[in-house]
Amino acid sequence: MRLTGSRPFAKDGSPSDRGESIAVLRRAVELGVNHIDTAAFYFSPLRSANELINTALGPYPADLVITTKVGPGRDSWGEWHSARPDQLRGQVEENLRQLGRDHLDVVNLRRRADQESIAEHFGALAELRQAGLIRHLGVSDVTVDQLTEALAIAPVVCVQNRYGFDLREHDPVLRACAERGIAFVPFFAIAGPSRQSGRRPPEPAPLLAVAGRHGATAAQIRLAWTLHQSPNVLAIPGTGNVAHLEENVAAAALRLSPDDLSLLDAAD
């Protein structure tokens, strides 16, 4: 999401440098990144994440998986709205048009904050999957019960929930995904709730200590800790900067020891 500019969900955010955003995407593929997360509502003044992806990477590499999201989203004025089940097809078609594709690899259903049952919305996406517009389905911001509800309707390949070093309330969902062979895709793995809102509290001493042991940044340790939680975890840290991208990718090579993990877990 950082591709489109600063304060991406704010109406007064600054658009990104188009050339740099395209360079980030192309460098990601060069580094072996084969999973990109996007959405039609990822935009800022003058910039659309889907359009940038289409320009930078089309025609797409055969092994590249592009995952998008539908459900509550923003209109062209930046206002947020819910979506009825019958409106999801329009959102899917918008993503298809912006990405320049005839199908979507993975579509996640975003759950509305006050939504208890996702059956009707997920069922609508399952119909679009049967129609060939979508290859695989996922869900986002769900509980274990809601995941179970979705699985009764159609296969689920991934769950995208908030999760990270200081944001661990979705541990039960992660474990449920691991048991079922479903990818768990955390967002805010680096940022966390405070950093995402723009605040920068001091990093915990244990995290800095582990970073020092590995000659890594605190952000890299946050990302490495998240990846160490389970083999089914896939990370989607956002960036609009090539150097930051390379730092994030390097974090995947960090191997935290049992002592490292114990120290970090004690800091929760």
Region annotations inferred by a language model:
Residues 96-114:
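Active-site groove signature of glycoside hydrolases
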Residues 36, 104, 137:
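Glycine-centered flexible beta-alpha turn that most often forms the glycine-rich phosphate-binding loop
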Residues 112-268:
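Beta/alpha (TIM)-barrel catalytic core signal, keyed to glycine-rich beta->alpha loops juxtaposed to Asp/Glu
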Residues 1-64, 191-193:
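N-terminal binding-site loop/beta-alpha segment at the start of enzyme catalytic domains
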Residues 1-12, 67-80, 103, 108:
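N-terminal small/glycine-rich loop or linker at the start of catalytic domains
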Residues 14-28, 82-99, 143-148:
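Short, acidic/polar
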Residues 29-30, 54-65, 96-100, 151-153, ...:
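Acidic (Asp/Glu)-rich catalytic clusters
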Residues 12-20, 48, 52, 79-90, ...:
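Alpha-helix N-cap and loop-to-helix initiation/capping positions
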